[in-house]
């Protein structure tokens, strides 16, 4: 599932092609057809990312909601002539400069601002947003008996963090993923927020996940293989000390950690 940096990057890149323009909204697959008709031909005012969610604000006040889930994917085609759809395209957004197709998304719907606000109200602060309130996430973690590896995947605690960033951020701070939130100090959790924010921002800039310190670890250009730009995630050995990496199941996903650098 795409992590928060991908969603913010999509909002930025797609916004340049769609925002401020009249957009033809269709559903080649048909599942989104009735919703598409509500905004077809209208001007798109804004694309707002929040955690792993995308919200499309239309000129008539309606708001589109997309959550990619595990299998959702966008395809961007530049030019003023829309190509033939490839596969099961749920939503197609076409302007005079580009066509953007969405397939396989967990959620693709048109609603109201109240619908959008209700979704956001269930989410924790998003480190990539200017209006984020870190204290809310820190308060929830420091009072919780849940393990840190589960808390960081809980989108009601902190929004946008996925399996890679949780493992890497916990490693940087030497926190074992099974340590309860209330066994961490407030200062530890505040610094963890800072690290997560920096990692996510770098992800938006690079359009890929690189968590290692580039000053110490050379990162190859182009497409990365798993483990080439991480300390513990999807690695056999810890990048720092060489200890075999272990995993623990938390939040329904395996969390990678180094038993030497992240003692219990």
Regions from the PLM with identified roles:
Residues 1-264:
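Structured catalytic/nucleic-acid-binding cores of DNA maintenance enzymes
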């Amino acid at each position: 599932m795409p992590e928060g940096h991908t969603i913010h990057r999509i909002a930025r890149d797609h916004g340049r092609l769609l925002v401020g323009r009249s957009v033809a909204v269709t559903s080649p697959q048909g599942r989104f057809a009735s919703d598409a008709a509500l905004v077809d031909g209208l001007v798109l005012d804004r694309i707002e990312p929040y955690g792993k969610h995308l919200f499309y604000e239309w000129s008539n006040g309606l708001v589109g909601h997309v959550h990619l889930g595990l299998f959702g994917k966008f395809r961007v085609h530049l030019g003023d002539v829309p190509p033939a759809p490839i596969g099961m395209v749920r939503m197609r957004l076409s302007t005079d400069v580009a066509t953007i197709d969405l397939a396989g998304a967990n959620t693709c719907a048109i609603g109201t601002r109240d619908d959008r606000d209700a979704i956001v109200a269930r989410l924790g602060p998003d480190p990539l947003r200017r209006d984020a309130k870190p204290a809310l996430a820190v308060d929830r973690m420091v009072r919780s008996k849940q393990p840190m590896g589960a808390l960081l995947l809980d989108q009601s605690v902190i929004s946008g963090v996925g399996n890679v960033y949780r493992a890497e951020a916990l490693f940087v701070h030497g926190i074992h993923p099974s340590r309860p939130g209330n066994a961490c100090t407030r200062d530890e959790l505040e610094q963890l927020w800072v690290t997560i924010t920096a990692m996510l921002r770098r992800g938006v800039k690079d359009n890929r996940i690189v968590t290692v310190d580039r000053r110490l670890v050379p990162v190859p250009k182009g497409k990365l293989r798993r483990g080439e730009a991480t300390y513990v995630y999807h690695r056999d050995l810890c990048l720092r000390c060489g200890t075999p990496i272990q995993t623990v199941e938390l939040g329904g996903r395996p969390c990678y950690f180094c038993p030497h650098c992240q003692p219990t």
